[in-house]
């Protein structure tokens, strides 16, 4: 008997890590709540919005801005078009995170290093959606905008929320592109 398109996939061989009270960053349009998700939910590097909803976080302010500039550049918009923004500092505590944060870990599941473009997403989406189906809380990977020094975290929504992720205070409003982070050209 041959396996059909709906045949169960073998579980992915990935290492699990725990994040305990780690600081992560998220930028969003001014006026949105921290974990606001548009309807319909958007696609991201690690998922199609129709399959799984994810909240994307960055390991530093610099990585958050680099990812924002990457998205603007891909749409052909200058950096100033993406402001003002809110920058949220949040605390993340998750017990079961799939660690795909190195080239070696990505290769183990058939992925190459991420490139800063949407056309690179489909193989990552297949892996992310399988991890979601397997019950993982999140995927940790290299930032496509800063692969050598930045990390991104895609936290999957469960039960209409993002357990283990909380903003401890109000966001900081940023009215213009930060000078300390160079936009991607």
Predicted ranges, named:
Residues 1-40, 46-48, 71-185:
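Active-site and NAD+-binding cores of ADP-ribose-processing enzymes
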Residues 45-75:
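Extended catalytic/binding region for NAD+/ADP-ribose chemistry, centered on the ART fold
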């Amino acid at each position: 008997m041959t396996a059909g398109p709906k045949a169960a996939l073998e579980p992915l061989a990935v290492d699990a890590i725990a994040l305990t009270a780690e600081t992560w960053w998220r930028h969003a349009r001014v006026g949105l709540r921290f974990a606001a998700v548009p309807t319909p939910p958007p696609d991201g590097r690690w998922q199609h919005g129709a399959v799984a909803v994810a909240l994307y976080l960055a390991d530093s302010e610099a990585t958050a801005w680099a990812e924002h500039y990457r998205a603007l550049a891909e749409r052909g918009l200058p950096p100033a078009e993406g402001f003002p923004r809110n920058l949220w500092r949040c605390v993340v505590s998750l017990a079961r995170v799939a660690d795909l944060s190195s080239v070696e870990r990505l290769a183990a599941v058939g992925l190459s290093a991420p490139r800063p473009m949407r056309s690179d997403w489909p193989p990552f989406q297949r892996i992310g959606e399988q991890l979601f189906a397997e019950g993982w809380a999140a995927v940790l990977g290299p930032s496509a905008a800063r692969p050598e020094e930045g990390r991104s975290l895609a936290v999957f929504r469960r039960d209409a929320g993002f357990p283990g992720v909380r903003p401890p205070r109000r966001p900081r409003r940023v009215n213009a592109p930060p000078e300390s982070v160079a936009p991607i050209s």
